[in-house]
Every structure is written in structure tokens, then in C-alpha cells.
């Protein structure tokens, strides 16, 4: 028997995707979702590991990637491979299947000239050895809207809200999203077709809640924001106690955002607002009367891997002037290993090979974690994951790598 990693062929998609679904528990996806991902999957960027036994073949490993552009500090949108659909059959664990796929995939990403690879991890412990570092975090909350009050900024009352069928206002909502992308690191410039993810609404995924609802915000005649949500009714001895389940919210200005949040707090017959996957620096946290009754929690979200260290570090800007030499360790992508001089500021940067002595020593995993500005190099240094060679270099680089806006991945892939 032989195992062969190779690029997926269109006629193999059903077998390949079936292997993926089985690895994630085997629960069939709703037909609408299945067909959308069939359309979105880039077959030429997808890999399967196939075991051949005589004339028979079976798929025992899957991975793929989407060709994204991701915002980085400074506002540039950098090419990034969105790694997805990673699985290994339970019958073939610890046989090198995952390593062979990651090897082929990162070689391909390099050949395509994409300086970054990014992913969301079902099991975070897996991906560090391949050079991925946790670069963004997301905020969840369970807000007791019967007890928590919201203090809103000036102009909030000028915002007009209207219900709309989600499909009818999809283009307007997508236009709002597109305007927000350059302003926050980690956001993805969506290709055509991706906006349809927001409309997926199978009954099996509602957990007792209503079909998807949408409210659109207008200010001065312009659509300035939207909220997509569901309502899960509940009744007890004291009356109604339903939950608003937020799916997505976006606003072009603070007043629009506040108006949308205030609306969600005030939905009739509800006393709770469930929030998932929001930016960790979102303003509502500082507008509430009692943050403890919001039960905020943070968790890891996007993992970043620098495939081309020089191109990736030169593609972003830096909050403060930085001139440091990194000694980079990268056993899995050895073309990155060695010394790199990064010189940059708020206007731009360069990153080139150098023979000069190192100022900081770290692995490519730490560079990935710090890349979007959400994880401080100084924190990684305190954890023993960055070694300072030149005194003061760690503080200099840590300040430079920072971002005023927390990086955020708005949706999975």
C-alpha cells in the first residue's frame, strides 16, 4: 500500500469532502452549505492524501487553501493563503499524513508568491510545529440585558433602523463590510461568493432560535451599518426571558454601532444577548453599566504563518521607528531561517537578509503571533519565547509591531 499526497481533481471532490466530514464527526452538512463550499473550494489549491491498495484508492487526508487578501497594520491588503479543511482519517494517525500535506501546501504557497498562510485551528496544539502562531483573539459575552444599561455617544439618535430581509440587503451590507476591511488588521477582503455565507440559515443550526433576521442602519440617507441575529424565545414563571443571538454586526461610525447595540438590548420579550467572535477592543464594553453581568471571555482565533519573512515584514508598517536584526529559526521552511534586518516606521518598511549580528532571536511562530499587532513581542519575551541579544531591542520592536486597533478575524473559513 502507498500513500500519495496530490492536488485534488474535481471528480474526487465528493470522496475528499466526505473524508473531511467523517473526521469532524460525520454529521452531514445541510445541502445548501455543502453546495456553497463545493463552489468556493479551489480544487487547484486543495490536496488529498490517497492510499492505494491494489486498484482501490481511499482518501485519508485533506487540506486546502483559499486565496485571500488580508489587512495588515498600515492598511495594506496582503496575499494570504487561507488554510482550511484539514483532516486526517482516524485510521491513519501518526503516520506522517498531516506533515506531508503541510509540507506540500507551504511549498505551494511559497511558489504562488503568497507571503502569509493563515488558519483557524480546531486543535491549536497541532499547528505550532508548522510555524503558526496565535495572532488574533475574539470576544464572546452573555449579556444580561435586563440589568445592564448602555451609555451611547452623541449622534446615536440620528441613526434610523429598519428591518429587512437578509437577502434583500445583502449587497448593501457587503458594501459596509468592504469599507471596514482596510481599517482593521486581520480582516479579509472577500471574493465574490463569500458574502453568501452570511445567508446560510439551516434550521438544524438555529438551536431553537428564529430564522435569521436583519436590521439595517441609515444615517443621512446612507446605509451605515447592519446587524444580523436570531431570537430564541423562552418563557418561565416570571414571563418572557428570550435570548438575542448575534450573528454579525458592523457600523461605519460610533453612533451607528451604538444604535445597533442599543436595539439588540431592547428586543421585546428578551433578557439576554449572546455575542460570539467580536473584536476584543469593541467599544460596547466601555458603554455598559456593569461589565461583570456581560461575562466577557476571550479566545484564540486566527493563526498566522510567515511563508516569506522578508516580504511579510516589509508589507506592513510600524507604529514607531524600528531597526532590528532578527535571528529567525524556521526548521519547517528553512528558506526563512537566518538573520533579517527590519527597518521601518509608519510610512513603510524594508526587510532584507543581513550578516550583521542579531538583536533578537525567535522562531517564525513568534513572528506570526506578533505580526498583526495583537500580541506584544515583549509578552512573548517574558514567556521565554523571544531572546533579547541587544539591550533595548525587545522594547523597540514591541512598540513598533503594535497596532492601535486590535486585529480581528470576522468569520471563519
From Swiss-Prot:
Q: Which NCBIfam families match?
A: PRK01346.1-4 (NF002367)
Q: Boundaries of each N-acetyltransferase domain copy?
A: 3-155
GO biological process: one example = aminoglycoside antibiotic catabolic process
Q: Which GO terms describe its molecular function?
A: aminoglycoside N-acetyltransferase activity
Which PROSITE patterns does the protein's record reference? GNAT
Q: Kindly give the InterPro entries that the UniProt entry links to this protein.
A: Acetyltransf_17 (IPR041380), Acetyltransferase_Eis (IPR051554), Acyl_CoA_acyltransferase (IPR016181), Eis_dom (IPR025559), GNAT_dom (IPR000182), NAcTrfase_Eis (IPR022902), SCP2_sterol-bd_dom_sf (IPR036527)
Give the taxonomic lineage as stored in the record. Bacteria, Bacillati, Actinomycetota, Actinomycetes, Kitasatosporales
Protein name, entry field: Uncharacterized N-acetyltransferase SCO2625
Which EC numbers does the record give? 2.3.1.-
In which residues is acetyl-CoA bound? 86-88, 94-99, 122-123
Active-site residues, record numbering mapped to chain: 127 (proton donor), 413 (proton acceptor)
What quaternary arrangement does the UniProt entry report?
Answer: Homohexamer; trimer of dimers.
Q: Which SUPFAM superfamilies match?
A: Acyl-CoA N-acyltransferases (Nat), SCP-like
Q: What class of enzyme is it?
A: transferase
Alphabetic keyword roster: Acyltransferase, Transferase
Protein family (similarity comment)? Belongs to the acetyltransferase Eis family.
